[in-house]
């Protein structure tokens, strides 16, 4: 006998990227982590917090982070809400806006967690297909019964493509509901949508420190929205959702913009090399604005290639999409990791 709600029993749940065993020598190029260590300032900040002690609750509003992030992003601190990773932010937004029976809209293919969040609420989800240029048409903004929230990952995963901010603003202004622009990968891109929050109160931008700041193991994210949105989200936020270590570390991370610029520049160079080399092997590679590349092949099935890489110690993400096709999403690693990955791709194609 199950005691869960029927929608929980019926759902599959979100399945994260495969994780190697602790101590394994497998190279992870499947979950879009940063291949380099975080800023040394982060390590010093964590040491300071530990020396101060962990016996007291943290600041429930992560004020130090919000103040510094506001300066970096050019928004007031009270336009920022922090969470235990941006996934918690996405969860809070879904809880706040979407009730049982409501409709949540998302692009396809994109981040599969969005659909899971709708299922948890007992809500419906509607997937709107990207066109061949990874753009969204009028059907994404069309009114629909019960439509309460829409997600737009920008840059998108798995494609790494980005819709320009001017087009995003047009989408938001036509939307009959709030539009969450998920900017998990935006620091690797040429532009961002933060300024749209000031122009349209339906725009909510979510960010994470997992990718560009190399803090995936820490769990810290935030969103930027107009104050009335932030005030509503505070009502449902867990009281102490961000711990003292993550607040201290994330504040130090966002303060070190010189480290961020250097790290992002290095990854962008490696991204270009990975994409060019994959194309030379015969893959079709979408121009990426993220820290990964999306590879398809005109004639070769990709699952055997994925399995060949896995057998030889390289994990990439094999992602088949119904009605769309299959692809390999390959995270940008170090130059040495990329060299091994490319050699294995070439080897697999010869089989």
Give each language-model segment a name.
Residues 1-56, 146:
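N-terminal "arm"/small-domain region of PLP-dependent enzymes with the aminotransferase-like
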Residues 78, 205, 281-284, 314-319:
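A short linear hydrophobic-aromatic micro-motif
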Residues 61, 202-286:
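PLP-dependent aminotransferase class I/II
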Residues 308-312, 317, 321-351:
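PLP-dependent enzyme catalytic core of the Aspartate aminotransferase-like
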Residues 126, 130-187:
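Active-site phosphate-binding strand-loop segment of PLP-dependent enzymes
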Residues 268, 280-312, 328:
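Conserved PLP-binding catalytic core of the aspartate aminotransferase-like
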Residues 8, 29, 69, 80, ...:
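Generic structural signal for small/hydrophobic residues in well-ordered secondary structure
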Residues 63-103, 121, 299:
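Phosphate-binding glycine-rich loop
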């Amino acid at each position: 006998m199950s005691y869960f709600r029927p929608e929980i029993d019926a759902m599959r749940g979100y399945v994260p990227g495969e994780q190697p065993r602790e101590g394994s020598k497998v190279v992870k190029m499947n979950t879009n982590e940063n291949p380099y260590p975080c800023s040394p300032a982060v390590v010093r900040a964590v040491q300071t917090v530990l020396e101060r002690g962990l016996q007291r609750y943290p600041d429930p509003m992560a004020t130090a982070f919000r103040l510094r992030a506001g300066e970096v992003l050019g928004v007031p601190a009270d336009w920022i809400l922090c969470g235990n990773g941006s996934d918690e932010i996405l969860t809070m937004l879904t809880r706040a806006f979407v009730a049982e029976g409501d409709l949540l809209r998302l692009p396809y293919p994109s981040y599969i967690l969005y659909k899971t969040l709708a299922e948890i609420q007992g809500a419906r989800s509607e997937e709107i297909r990207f066109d061949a240029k990874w753009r969204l048409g009028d059907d994404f903004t069309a009114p629909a019964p019960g439509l309460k929230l829409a997600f737009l990952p920008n840059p998108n995963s798995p494609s790494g493509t980005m819709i320009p901010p001017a087009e995003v603003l047009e989408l938001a202004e036509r939307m009959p509901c709030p539009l969450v622009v998920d900017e998990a990968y935006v620091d690797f891109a040429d532009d961002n949508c933060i300024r749209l929050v000031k122009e349209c109160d339906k725009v909510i931008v979510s960010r994470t420190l997992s990718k560009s700041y190399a803090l995936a193991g820490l769990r810290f994210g935030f969103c930027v929205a107009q104050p009335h949105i932030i005030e509503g989200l505070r009502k449902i936020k867990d009281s102490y959702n961000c711990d003292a270590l993550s607040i201290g570390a994330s504040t130090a991370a966002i303060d070190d913009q010189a480290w961020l610029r250097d790290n992002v520049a290095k990854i962008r160079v490696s991204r270009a090399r990975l994409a060019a080399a994959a194309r030379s092997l015969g893959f079709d590679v979408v121009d990426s604005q993220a820290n990964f590349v999306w590879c398809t092949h005109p004639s070769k099935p990709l699952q055997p290639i994925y399995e060949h890489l896995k057998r030889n110690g390289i994990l990439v993400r094999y992602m088949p999409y119904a009605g769309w096709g299959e692809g390999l999403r390959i995270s940008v690693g170090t130059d040495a990791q990329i060299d091994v990955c490319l050699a294995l791709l070439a080897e697999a194609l010869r089989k």
